[in-house]
Amino acid sequence: MITSKKELKRVLEIESNSYQLSISQRILGLFGLSERGIIWNYQNRLRKYEYHLNCNHRVRSTIYHFLVNRLSFRYGMAIEPNAVDEGMHICHVGKILIRGKVGKYSTIHIHVSLVGGACDIAPVCGDNVYFGIGSTIVGGIKVGSNVCIGAGAVVTSDVESNCTVAGVPAKIINRRGPLDWH
């Protein structure tokens, strides 16, 4: 939860370094012409919205809420404020729905969904989780740290730390975690 300008600056610097954007890519992202620029623009606005929301800056949080929602509708990325901790890396522009808690240094591909099930309790994921393309995490489950969720996997039960899961429903396929994926 970002509650100070110093912390906001630190989080933005960490996340900015993962995209390695040039000035021209950042500018092109403002006009929707650079994929990494678009992602960074969305992420930058989301983090500033979180900061202003957490500090009860009503006018600024309303402005950033509008800016984040505008990009969400345009590109299909819907991440709730304070849902993802620092170090989030979004790989591609596309449908992303996060309505749960995700720890530090997560990697998120397109068509990823973290949603509550019928009980409407959101999933909780640990640090350093890799979400493959089209992965879905449903219900009030817990995903441990250092976990890879394979492409198209549907996770419906708790996942222990340091493993890779895949399939429908997701099952552990190895215990090496993200070492195989990076």
Question: Predicted segments — roles?
Answer:
Residues M1-Y75, D180-H182:
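Terminal amphipathic alpha-helical/low-complexity segments used for targeting or macromolecular assembly
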Residues Y75, E80, D85-G87, C91-H92, ...:
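Left-handed beta-helix
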